[in-house]
Amino acid sequence: IQIEYLENGDYTETVINDELPDNVVISPFATTKTITKSKTTYYKNSAGTVLWSVTIKGTFTYNGSTSKCTSCSHSTTAPSSAWSIKSASHSKSGNTATARATATQTTSTGTKDFSMSVTIKCSANGTVS
């Protein structure tokens, strides 16, 4: 878990989600393994309430000497009525995948945009970070 505190009293929390199946090996003799994981960055207020989030999901292959991201996707949530997702995208390069999102906060004084990104990476031995 990674936590970053912001100047306005809010903070972001990034976690790797473990609910996805780990290794999918096509054959017991296969030298290349496949792993799918997701990683989420939550934007929370000082009380710990999730205001919005962005998730990157990546599928990787690895063989002990190299690793590669073969596909990725992103998702967003904005459970707070004061927040809405303005834009979101994802990209992959080598053994990493990144999701980027911008959310808009609406208050009585107007609107303000906040941006976050989350990157997931797989090592040659299948360690996801």
Q: What is the meaning of each model-derived region?
A:
Residues 36-90:
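Short helix-loop boundary/capping segments
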Residues 33, 43-51, 104-115:
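Short, cysteine-centered beta-strand-loop-beta hairpins and adjacent loop/turn segments enriched
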Residues 35, 95-105:
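A short hydrophobic beta-strand element
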Residues 5-8, 89-98:
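Short, ordered beta-strand-loop transition motifs
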Residues 22-26, 70-81, 126-129:
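A short, surface-exposed interaction/processing loop segment used at functional sites
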Residues 54-64, 110-129:
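A short, surface-exposed beta-strand/turn
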Residues 1-45:
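N-terminal prepro-regions of secreted/extracellular proteins
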Residues 11, 66-67, 95-99, 125-128:
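Hydrophobic residues embedded in beta-strands of well-ordered beta-sheets
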